[in-house]
From Swiss-Prot:
The keyword Magnesium applies. It is an enzyme of class 3 (hydrolase). Belongs to the dUTPase family. Keywords: Hydrolase, Magnesium, Metal-binding, Nucleotide metabolism. Its EC number is 3.6.1.23. This enzyme is involved in nucleotide metabolism: it produces dUMP, the immediate precursor of thymidine nucleotides and it decreases the intracellular concentration of dUTP so that uracil cannot be incorporated into DNA. This is Deoxyuridine 5'-triphosphate nucleotidohydrolase. Pathway: Pyrimidine metabolism; dUMP biosynthesis; dUMP from dCTP (dUTP route): step 2/2. Substrate binds at R67, S68, G69, N80, L84, I85, D86, M94. The gene is dut. It comes from Paraburkholderia phytofirmans (strain DSM 17436 / LMG 22146 / PsJN) (Burkholderia phytofirmans). The keyword Amino-acid biosynthesis does not apply.
């Protein structure tokens, strides 16, 4: 699929989102910072990417997801857990960054911070009913299908 990409910061021309391998699902997004950003434990920051996208097709959306290494090794995850980019959004991609770790983390300019994944979207239509057809699970919720 083709995705319209607008470069908002000239430095990003040489740092375009890219798939790390042929099997990668996510495009790496970088922190478009002028200087290093220090995040103390528990702090959050909204980090610019220097890029804007326009998916343009209501059958798709983009997700901003954390990079697994940053989360596991340093406790750096997304403040909103997942960023949903609707197909009609055209503004700069911003990364809500949260240091859930126990030590201070320094984010350097142009460091890979998150990943962008394009996903198909189906918009649902509601069918109002008085009752549901019986299923094996019924209304069983959290933990209702067993311990393991």
């Amino acid at each position: 699929m083709k995705l319209d990409l607008k470069i908002l910061d000239a430095r990003m021309r040489d740092q375009l989102p890219a798939y790390a391998t042929t099997g990668s699902a996510g495009l790496d997004l970088r922190a478009c910072l002028d200087e290093a950003l220090t995040l103390k434990p528990g702090e959050t920051a909204l980090v610019p990417t220097g890029l804007a996208i326009h998916v343009g097709d209501a059958g798709y959306a983009a997700l901003i997801l954390p990079r697994s290494g940053l989360g596991h090794k340093h406790g750096i995850v997304l403040g909103n857990l997942v960023g949903l980019i609707d197909s009609d959004y055209q503004g700069q991609l911003m990364i809500s960054t949260w240091n859930r770790g126990e030590t201070t983390f320094v984010l350097n300019p142009m460091e890979r911070l998150a990943q962008l994944v394009i996903v198909p979207v189906v918009q649902a239509e509601f069918n109002i009913v008085d009752d549901f057809e019986t299923s094996d699970r019924g209304a069983g919720g959290f933990g209702s299908t067993g311990k393991h």
